[in-house]
Amino acid sequence: MSISNISIKAVLTMLLTCGLAVAQSPSLLKPEEKAASSPATNLPSEATVNSFMQQTFGYEAQVTWKISSIKPAPVPGLAQVDVILAGPQGQQLSRFYVTSDGDHAVIGEIIPFGAHPFAAVQKKLANGAAGPSRGPKDSPVLIVEFGDLQCPACKAAQPAIEALVAAEPTVRFVFQNFPLEMHNWAAKGAAYADCVGLASNEAFWKFVSKTYDAQSDITAANADEKLTALADGAGVKGADIAACAATPVTKGHVDASIAFGKAVGVTGTPTLFINGRSIGNISQVPAETLKSLVDFAAKQGK
């Protein structure tokens, strides 16, 4: 849909949630992002985007923004614009698309289309999802969550995800780290989680649950202390986990998980994939709908 002053006001509330977050830096355009344009794509200038934002949000004194990136969209003929919005509800990176003539902006997801729209992503996930897992590896249903331990929406979604996995013991469930750069201890949390997972698959799930429970008490300043204690509480040696989390190797693991998420189209946390089908705002999806999606995927996978 095209953006209007009325619709974008409504969309602002939706955008300022973790569910539509994009793992991008709050900095202005990076050189590699500027170089990503191709002759076939007409990219709007920073000045034009800023003017658009001013005309759209200027009446909202509490809303500020910063351009994160302007680059070609995954499909021809559209430019993808990522802008960090900040308001009373917090800070979040939102995305919209601009048509090649520069006359229209579009809010919404670009989703796969075709006779088998989820097959390509399903194959990538089956081959590349390497995080801690539960359930049989030969299951016809693969559920992959991309999560951020500092994201409140991820915490809110956990009961629904845990209930789904508990009710469907024959599915395979994999967790992939996807810390958002706008969260100041998320990357560290992901590093600790990675190390806990390597030490003990059982301890990993306890660590994730405990970290979500303690989420509001963790800050950038006390993250090492809190996460070390949580690792101890999960049944592994916290000091060893802290040492592991600080290594370049672990950073590489986390960076690889983020890159993998981007490669399968993750634009926010939590994102759940059920046999390649992407589901956001998980806590808002009724349990019976999630079960129906799993049952349908199981039938399709046979």
Segments (PLM) and residue ranges:
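C-terminal cap of thioredoxin/glutaredoxin-like
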Residues: 3, 24-46, 50-107, 228-302
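Structural alpha/beta surface segment adjacent to cysteine/selenocysteine redox centers
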Residues: 144-232, 262-267, 293-302
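A short, surface-exposed interaction/processing loop segment used at functional sites
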Residues: 100-132
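Bacterial N-terminal signal peptides that target proteins for export
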Residues: 2-12
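A short beta-strand-turn-helix
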Residues: 124-141, 165
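Sec/Tat signal peptide C-region and signal peptidase I cleavage site
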Residues: 19-23
